[in-house]
């Protein structure tokens, strides 16, 4: 939720943000009107209540002849106070509803436009070149007996898979590598719940335009999370945090679930776009004044992972119209996928400023002793999709895959992933 004071004092900023996103500006006008009605209703209620209290004192002091009249006036005022209180509550609810329809205010410099209007920040690394026809990740995975899409579909349906043998080991190694980097950077690891309450899912902004991508258990009224960001944001809901020693940082490891609604026909081959996957998510609670610096810190950690895995990648500043409702700015890190001849998103990091914290009631106490909403940020440090880039980038002509040096300690020192036929022949 955006700051109501910003809406009140600078509605032009909110309108400009909506225009950058290509979103409705009418909702801003509606929220401004609702805020005005709320303040008028509260003023009326407080005035009538003060009048009621004053009459109550007069009744206590009145002589016998005047008491019936004053009591009648008090009763009338009581009814008016009750009605005014109801109007104030209704106005408060209307404002809350209007405010929840306004996404976060984008940060200065975020490019305008939609999915294809991102700004390139940098390209890093040399794209893999081969003296043979490269295989895609699924063909490599089948040669290694590491990825089984057929049985995944048999057991669970389309966009499900098994990671088998070295495939399972590779994913666990990747996650442990990311976790080691998180610990090195001082993040506290958490294994998070994957089922959350509606108020937590709504508080993080995932029940807006993309609600159809979320799995819901109707009988229990719980949501399956598509990222541990949701649980990590809810972890300190309705709390006052102590940031005197600096930001509070977590690394959440969880299984994630996404419906991939609207993705029909996209990435149907392999494990680029699946319904279930593993993810290690960084999450920071910081003083809002430090949020942009923290965003750069998270991005630097992601880039270091890309470099240590030997992946060519680019960093883009996502356009406003392609941001989720909670994000004020989002950087995507996209790795080069040789067989697609394209960069594909492997990870992203978002600065949600105080948007989620306002919804979830997460505050911190400043130097002046007053409390105010914290800023929250998130970024992925490892996930299943990275296997795609690792297999394709480091493949060899015989179907084997060279293991990046940084990953070898997490695979028992293994230097090469060998085809299953070669292993069987030994």
From Swiss-Prot:
It comes from the Bacteria. GO terms for molecular function: ATP binding; serine-tRNA ligase activity. SUPFAM superfamilies: Class II aaRS and biotin synthetases, tRNA-binding arm. One of its GO terms (cellular component) is cytoplasm. GO terms for biological process: selenocysteine biosynthetic process; seryl-tRNA aminoacylation. Its EC number is 6.1.1.11. Signal peptide: none annotated. It catalyses: tRNA(Ser) + L-serine + ATP = L-seryl-tRNA(Ser) + AMP + diphosphate + H(+); tRNA(Sec) + L-serine + ATP = L-seryl-tRNA(Sec) + AMP + diphosphate + H(+). It holds the Pfam family tRNA-synt_2b. L-serine binds at residues 227-229, 281, 380. The keyword Nucleotide-binding applies. Keywords: Aminoacyl-tRNA synthetase, ATP-binding, Cytoplasm, Ligase, Nucleotide-binding, Protein biosynthesis. ATP binds at residues 258-260, 274, 345-348. Pathway: Aminoacyl-tRNA biosynthesis; selenocysteinyl-tRNA(Sec) biosynthesis; L-seryl-tRNA(Sec) from L-serine and tRNA(Sec): step 1/1. It is found in: Cytoplasm. It is an enzyme of class 6 (ligase). The keyword Aminoacyl-tRNA synthetase applies. Consists of two distinct domains, a catalytic core and a N-terminal extension that is involved in tRNA binding. Homodimer. The tRNA molecule binds across the dimer. Belongs to the class-II aminoacyl-tRNA synthetase family. Type-1 seryl-tRNA synthetase subfamily. NCBIfam families: serS. Catalyzes the attachment of serine to tRNA(Ser). Is also able to aminoacylate tRNA(Sec) with serine, to form the misacylated tRNA L-seryl-tRNA(Sec), which will be further converted into selenocysteinyl-tRNA(Sec). This is Serine--tRNA ligase. The lineage of its organism: Bacteria, Bacillati, Actinomycetota, Actinomycetes, Micrococcales. The gene is serS.
